[in-house]
């Protein structure tokens, strides 16, 4: 099935919404702006280049309190690595934005893989009942599909970083969702999804 898009808003075109930037075809230099663009990544080397580029822009765009850059570094690496290790998708996508007036950093990481629920169902240890249950498990310490490829602390660590800084975080995967907003956590179910095999995670 092919789609034709007409009259694309200038803002979406500038973000590369329909044509994400490929790290392999775009040389990222230290002076390049990696923010406000959608990037596609396929492997750990591309993750490394993107994380370094995004963090370089963060440092020069906004004055961050102690520990913020380290937290962003850790969170980006962990969650983007989750895409490579667990999603079974060919690639993932990432975009980072800074709102200078509010001093907020927004980061979105997406993949169209099998989803957290189907990934954890392959585990011999964990047996989530549904997608919301799987997401709630994923933000607990030490939960992973396979201990040989990860310690299971990525989502848990990011959740705690956001929580301690009274930030906001949302996870949507398959039919389930979880939101954390200034210390208040909620889960959602029966979210619409396009494909049973590619449940996707954001």
Model-found features: residue ranges?
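Short beta-strand element(s) in the Bergerat
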Residues: 103-107, 201
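STAS-like cytosolic regulatory interaction modules
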Residues: 1-57, 67
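Acidic ATP/Mg2+-coordinating residue in the GHKL
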Residues: 111
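Glycine-rich G1-box
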Residues: 114
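Conserved ATP-binding N-box helix of the HATPase_c
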Residues: 66-101, 159-162
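Helix-loop-beta hinge of the Bergerat
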Residues: 34-64, 117, 124-141, 160
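Flexible, glycine-/charge-rich segments associated with ATP-binding catalytic modules
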Residues: 22-32, 45-46, 124-129, 140-202
């Amino acid at each position: 099935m092919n789609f034709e898009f007409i009259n694309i808003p200038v803002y979406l075109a500038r973000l590369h919404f329909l044509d994400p930037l490929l790290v392999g075809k775009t040389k990222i230099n230290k002076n390049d702006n990696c923010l406000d663009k959608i990037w596609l990544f396929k492997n750990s080397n591309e993750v490394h280049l993107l994380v370094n580029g995004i963090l370089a822009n963060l440092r020069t765009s906004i004055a961050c309190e102690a520990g913020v850059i380290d937290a962003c570094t850790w969170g980006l690496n962990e969650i983007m690595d989750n895409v490579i290790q667990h999603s079974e998708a060919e690639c993932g996508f990432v975009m980072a934005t800074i709102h200078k007036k509010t001093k907020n950093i927004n980061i979105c990481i997406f993949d169209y893989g099998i989803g957290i629920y189907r990934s954890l169902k392959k585990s011999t240890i964990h047996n989530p009942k549904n997608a919301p249950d799987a997401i709630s498990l994923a933000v607990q310490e030490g939960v992973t599909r396979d201990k040989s490829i990860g310690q299971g602390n990525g989502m848990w660590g990011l959740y705690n970083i956001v929580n301690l800084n009274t930030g906001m975080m949302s996870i949507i995967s398959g039919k389930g969702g979880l939101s954390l907003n200034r210390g208040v956590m909620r889960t959602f179910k029966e979210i619409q999804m396009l494909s049973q095999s590619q449940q996707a995670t954001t």
